[in-house]
UniProtKB/Swiss-Prot annotation:
Palmitoylated; catalyzes its own palmitoylation. Palmitoylation is required for Golgi targeting. Farnesylation is required for Golgi targeting. It comes from the Eukaryota. The lineage of its organism: Eukaryota, Metazoa, Chordata, Craniata, Vertebrata. A lipid is attached at residue 195 (S-farnesyl cysteine). It comes from Xenopus laevis (African clawed frog). This is Synaptobrevin homolog YKT6-B.
Length: 198
């Protein structure tokens, strides 16, 4: 999972222009880096130009995903990431960056601003912080821990059962479970197996 670009743009009436951007092109060869960076800027501007105000969308290009968020006030953000990077985290990042940008940079400067004139330096730190979505986003961290717990729980259940033994057999032989609990287990098992067949 990797983030390559984080950009803040202004969607004017006739033209979209870049206000500020940060790039991580370290995974590309040295001679390709400037071309890749130019292409990311071009792609970001094109996607914002073709997106409606008040919209969020993701555009796939080969193994990359471009996530765009254009606010109603014409401020827009674009994240370019690989396919594996979670889109929810990208949109959370865009929302956070655009909100912070709008409070730190005067709205009057947006239509005429450029990367050289806009005083906002947080993009590089956001780009590096969000390289690992699990560390940057609490929901991703919780989801990953939940997935790990499910795997451990599944492995534990498998190891508790002896070779050739099935949970169904154990339930039917159990003296601890009441008839109502056994009936509930069998009914649940039948309903789940019905869904598996379809």
């Amino acid at each position: 999972m990797k983030l390559y670009s984080l950009s803040v743009l202004y969607k004017g009436e006739n033209k979209v222009h870049l206000l500020k951007s940060a790039y991580d092109v370290s995974s590309f060869s040295f001679f390709q880096r400037s071309s890749v960076q130019e292409f990311m800027t071009f792609t970001s501007q094109l996607i914002v130009e073709r997106s409606d105000k008040g919209s969020r969308s993701s555009v796939k290009e080969q193994e990359y995903l471009c996530h765009v968020y254009v606010r109603n006030d014409s401020l827009a953000g674009v994240v370019i990431a690989d396919n594996e990077y979670p889109p929810r985290v990208c949109f959370t990042l865009l929302e956070k960056v655009l909100e912070e940008f709008s409070t730190q940079v005067d709205r009057i400067d947006w239509p005429s601003g450029s990367p050289a004139t806009i005083q906002y330096n947080a993009l590089d730190s956001y780009l590096s912080k969000y390289q690992n979505p699990r560390d940057a986003d609490p929901m991703s961290k919780v989801q990953a821990e939940l997935d790990e717990t499910k795997i451990v729980l599944h492995n534990t259940m498998e190891s508790l059962l002896q070779r050739g033994e099935k949970l169904d057999d154990l339930v039917s032989k159990s003296e601890v479970l009441g008839t109502q609990s056994k009936a509930f287990y069998k009914t649940a098992r039948k309903q789940n197996s019905c869904c598996d067949i379809m």
